């Protein structure tokens, strides 16, 4: 994974083309799958907060077990809420409906702040370093 990122654009295109031809898939699908794997490898082996995230699976997990034959469009990741200051069992406490709504709102705000203030700066620095380019990841303000 790390080796290919250092190859020239021509070498990368060649391996993508050869893989696409062998698997009878489009180049775009092969390249997209490469980047999904690249991001997963980074998140779970190099990322500062790797011990606080969990791979939820979805399409990627089903694909690994040969349950389906399609490529992932996204990466499903869950955050360990203990990094936000909650105890392991706190989200499971019995609450009234209103208390649960307030708790959900609070954890969503804290998660959003953690991602934007803690995670994104490291992701941008690390990806810039890994890819040798200025890199900017951001949270789309229209995405909720």
Give residue ranges: language-model regions.
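Compositionally biased terminal segments of proteins
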Residues: 1-144
